[in-house]
From Swiss-Prot:
Result when mutating K51A: Loss of catalytic activity
Primary site of residence: membrane
Protein name, entry field: Guanylate-binding protein 7
Name of the gene encoding the protein in the UniProt record: Gbp7
Family: Belongs to the TRAFAC class dynamin-like GTPase superfamily. GB1/RHD3 GTPase family. GB1 subfamily.
Database matches in InterPro entries: G_GB1_RHD3_dom (IPR030386), GBP_C (IPR037684), Guanylate-bd/ATL_C (IPR003191), Guanylate-bd_C_sf (IPR036543), Guanylate-bd_N (IPR015894), P-loop_NTPase (IPR027417)
Molecular function GO terms recorded: GTP binding; GTPase activity
Disruption of the gene: reported phenotype: Mice show a dramatic susceptibility to T.gondii infection, resulting in rapid death of infected mice in the acute phase of infection. A significantly increased parasite load seen in the spleen, liver and the peritoneal fluid, with markedly elevated production of pro-inflammatory cytokines and development of severe ascites.
Region (C-terminal tail): 590-638
Length: 638
């Protein structure tokens, strides 16, 4: 089990003491360490029907979940056992054993209903365990399924607006398996041999008639058929005919159990291992251990506060928590990759921006992988701002590294020049020419220094600015120059200074243009990955709707075949409405891009510092500065 302990024994997940449910923090801590998707198998049934034995077999053990040896129900609340999946190494198998339903020692029968509802909400495969046969009495005992509409909400509504949204259950309910223990009948129907699945489906056929008695008898049948489209049945012979041995069945060697029971148990386990899927919420949200922990806590908190557990609220809680973590993961990835791939100072700004673009693309992908239900792209916008701030910090670090490196190199290269000035080497006739030659050599040597970075021209320009007064002093004292020559030299110096300043401004303009282009790439990358994610989500919704439609059409067909024409016709409106929703969803594809551009695009421009109009304003200011410099140069020439 990746990122989690291999549990040697079960722990209580939801405690049920004095008719109050409480989440066990120890179990939550175990779940929070499981990063793999979880296949959750929950078993529910009347007390003392051998549920725990089946769960122990799934765990590959004889012992673990408490079987008990008396008529008292041993399992209280919901117990959990997390084990490595025996055939899917990338998944963790989470087994949930629930306390027996219908225990006479319980006071409030609602307690059983909540346990039943929690088992449905948490599992990807729901096993209902009963004894002997699936008859009228067995279906009556499964009345808990008829109460699910009062115990579970798919969508968030206020109490005054509560509506029956059980139509949505099919999109997130688990697969349903009915296990019949100590099966006493032959699998035959009207003289022909049938499968256990056919036996179940025959038992779920509606009883003809519209009497109150028939409607009451049909209610659990209809609920199972409507809520659980994927159904399976397993029947088991008695493990042993020896009543005394039966009490201690967990201690019996497997080869001493009835052969048929051994085969049936292996078939059951094999089916679970091969066919049980990872726990998935609506729209394809796959649940790992950490998410399961949040779901358990959210549902139990809702029950204890007097509310009905709501899937939409639970998903919102999950999204708020995980999307914040997704932003942090993505931002950390960006920082780590930038630090690994860059050597400061970079030779050019473009070198840094190229690395930034690659790292940002990866960071956005990390966010998309770990986020879901990001309403209005709130968290993606946070990531955009965070990455922009980190990029600005790297730009500052790059500038500081370049400044420090260039200043150190220039100080070293100009040391001889400074010493010559101090010693008065240039205070002789022809000294101005000697000074210019010495300074030119410093500039040429500086030019050959590798990887000076983005502040190379700035440092050189500052150095040359510091030499203006020194050059003028040397020139004025040079007796080899006439007044006319001095005037010409002064004009040349001014022209060179203006050209250097112009060159610096051109560099700034070029760098600003590069930053703008990087912002545009950032915008396009965010939109592209968002579009891809939204398209995937749209397809998931469409797939769920099509599964729901297929399920409704099957129910309608079965109703018609069973002679319930009125019920069949009543479904026409539901089916028609669902078909319209599917068509609308298909048409959304063409407008998806425009929606992203209109919504998220505008926000990106406003939340990213220095983008959009700010870049345009910066370009105008720089352009104005360049024009002013050029005009000043023209005035000097005149």
């Amino acid at each position: 089990m990746a990122s989690g302990p291999n549990m040697e024994a079960p722990v209580c997940l939801v405690e049920n003491e004095n008719e109050e449910l409480r989440v066990n923090s120890k179990a939550i801590n175990i779940l929070e360490r499981i990063t793999q998707p979880v296949v959750v198998v929950a078993i529910v049934g009347l007390y003392r029907t051998g549920k725990s034995y089946l769960m122990n077999r799934l765990a590959g053990q004889n012992h673990g979940f408490n079987l008990g040896t008396t008529v008292r129900s041993e399992t209280k609340g919901i117990w959990m056992w997390c084990v490595p999946h025996p055939s899917k190494p990338k998944f963790t198998l989470v087994l949930l054993d629930t306390e027996g339903l219908g225990d006479v020692e319980k006071g409030d029968p609602k307690n059983d209903s909540w346990i039943f509802a929690l088992a449905v909400l948490l599992s990807s495969t729901f096993v209902y365990n009963s004894m002997s046969t699936i008859n009228h009495q067995a279906l009556e005992q499964l009345h808990y399924v008829t109460e699910l509409t009062e115990r579970i909400r798919a969508k968030s509504t206020s109490r005054s607006e509560e509506v029956d949204d059980s139509d949505e259950f099919v999109s997130f309910f688990p697969d349903f398996i009915w296990t019949v223990r100590d099966f006493v009948l032959e699998l035959k129907l009207e003289g022909r041999v049938i499968t256990a699945d056919e036996y179940l489906e025959n038992a779920l056929k509606l009883i003809p008639g519209m009497s109150i008695k028939a409607q009451k008898a049909n209610l659990p049948r209809e609920c199972i058929r409507h809520f659980f489209p994927r159904r399976k049945c397993f029947v088991f012979d008695r493990p042993t005919k020896d009543k005394e041995l039966l009490v201690h069945v967990e201690e019996m060697p497997e080869d001493q159990l009835d052969h048929s029971f051994q085969v049936q148990s292996k078939e059951f386990c094999s089916y679970i291992f091969s066919n049980s899927k990872a726990k998935t919420l609506k729209e394809g949200i796959v649940v790992n251990g950490n998410r399961l922990a949040t779901l358990v806590t959210t549902y139990v908190d809702a029950i204890n506060s007097g509310d009905v557990p709501c899937l939409e609220n639970a998903v919102t809680t999950l999204a708020q928590r995980e999307n914040s973590i997704a932003v942090q993961k993505a931002a950390d990835h960006y920082s780590e990759q930038m630090a690994q791939r860059m050597r400061l100072p970079t030779d050019t700004l473009q070198e840094l921006l190229t690395v930034h673009t690659a790292c940002e693309k990866e960071a956005i992908a990390v966010f998309m992988e770990h986020s879901f239900k990001d309403e209005n792209q709130q968290f993606q916008k946070n990531l955009v701002v965070t990455i922009e701030e980190k990029k600005e910090d790297f730009l500052r670090q790059n500038e500081a590294a370049s400044l420090s490196h260039c200043q150190a190199e220039l100080d070293k290269l100009s040391e001889s020049l400074r010493e010559s000035i101090s010693r008065g080497v240039f205070s002789v006739p022809g000294g101005h020419r000697l000074y210019l030659e010495a300074r030119k050599k410093v500039e040429q040597d500086y030019e050959r220094v590798p990887r000076k970075g983005v502040k190379a021209n700035h440092v050189l320009q500052s150095f040359l600015q510091s030499q203006i007064s020194i050059e003028d002093s040397i020139m004025q004292s040079d007796k080899a120059l006439t007044d006319g020559q001095k005037a010409m030299e002064a004009e040349r110096a001014q022209k060179e200074a203006a050209e250097k300043e112009q060159e610096l401004l051109r560099q700034k303009q070029k760098e600003l243009q590069q930053v703008m282009e990087a912002q545009e790439r950032s915008y396009k990358e965010n939109v592209a990955q968002l579009h891809e994610k939204m398209e995937t989500e749209r397809k998931n919704i469409l797939r769920e709707q099509e599964v729901k439609l297929e399920h409704k059409l099957k129910i309608q067909k079965d109703m018609l075949n069973e002679g319930f024409k009125r019920k069949c016709e009543a479904m026409d409106l539901e089916i028609s409405q669902l078909q319209k929703e599917i068509q609308l969803n298909k048409e959304k594809n063409s407008s998806l891009g425009a929606k992203i551009l209109d919504g998220f695009g505008d926000v990106l421009i406003s939340v990213v510092p220095g983008s959009g109009k700010y870049f345009g304003l910066g370009l105008k200011i720089l352009s104005s500065q360049m024009n002013q410099t050029q005009n000043s140069d023209k005035v000097r020439k005149l």
